[in-house]
Curated annotation (Swiss-Prot):
Protein name: UPF0145 protein Acel_2109
Family matches, as Pfam families: YbjQ_1
Highest classification ranks of the organism: Bacteria, Bacillati, Actinomycetota, Actinomycetes, Acidothermales
Organism from which the protein derives: Acidothermus cellulolyticus (strain ATCC 43068 / DSM 8971 / 11B)
InterPro entries: UPF0145_dom_sf (IPR035439), UPF0145_YbjQ-like (IPR002765)
Family note: Belongs to the UPF0145 family.
Amino acid sequence: MLIVTTNEIPGYRIDEILGSVWGLTVRSRNIVSQFGAGLKSIFGGELRGMTTVLIDSRNQAMQRLVEEATARGANAILAMRFDTSEIGGMWTEICAYGTAARVSRLNS
């Protein structure tokens, strides 16, 4: 699966646009890590536990994005983006989205 943040892929022709696809995950924050993050924010520095959760969440959202595009018969995702939002102060939503497409390599 080719995944790009652009609307086109150099060296490829877009044969068919299959529509919008997305992968979503919502994660709750652990009370202990929230407390630790609160203390860390007072003194400064990276919130490693939260960073790890966000990396894992983005990876899961990407995996779900690819699964949906594959189910539609796509071999590429164009204009891929991430959106992150907080829900109720306790959950983090991560959404990966883009346009599923069938592409083919141009003759050189």
